[in-house]
Amino acid sequence: MKRIFCAILCLTVLLTGCGSDSSKLSESQLYEQEFDTSKYDSHITFAVDGTSTEKELTEVAKQLEQRIERCFAERNDDHPSVTHQLQTNHADKTVTIYFNNTANLSSQFMEFTAAPNKVELKKGDKADGEIMIAAGEFYDAYAQQDKASGNGSWSVAVKLTNNGRTKFEKALKKMNGKGEQVTLWLDGKALGTYAAEKAVGSGGIITVTGGELIDKQAAWELAYRLRSGHIENKVTVKECSVKEKTQAA
């Protein structure tokens, strides 16, 4: 039987049930409830590999759900929260999220939610370069524009964890004066660089520039993916039906 979980993200990011008695239901009971998905104009179904138990699939489902919630919180000032239903099917190892596309996100963008987001900072510009810090050592990221420069170039500010900052600073000291560069890799693709001669900024922030960061959209997407965290399991988009209203996100 398909197990269904209903989550409504409020502005306070509280998880509530559906209906007046929903708060009295246990999690297992919530998964057994049947809900009407016809009230949603969009949905995306993910196939998840590498889960052997319902608990493991549920954990991945929660990560995917959080990514969808983040999309709406960051891309839509008018509707910063998203009412949605999350459905897991352990037999098929799939996760489906039904929602109303009030943020007008495109199908192409929605597929980013399935990306592993394995981020690494490596010495040099080669894929086999020495890893300086890896996934789990990045705390936050945001796109920014250098308005003082003539071309208004975009970059991504990346905040490291305390452990990540310590490791990165030690690695930078060893590179000092050697003219080497640091490259940010995401899912096996080089997306930006960091000048090795620069010190880590206040609060453990480094600025990644160049590479694929050609405009606001590219910088925002990279920052969003860095904030979304790494999913260990292989996740692919099995089906995506998104109602786009005017201009795609």
PLM region spans:
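Sec-dependent bacterial lipoprotein signal peptides
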Residues: 1-16
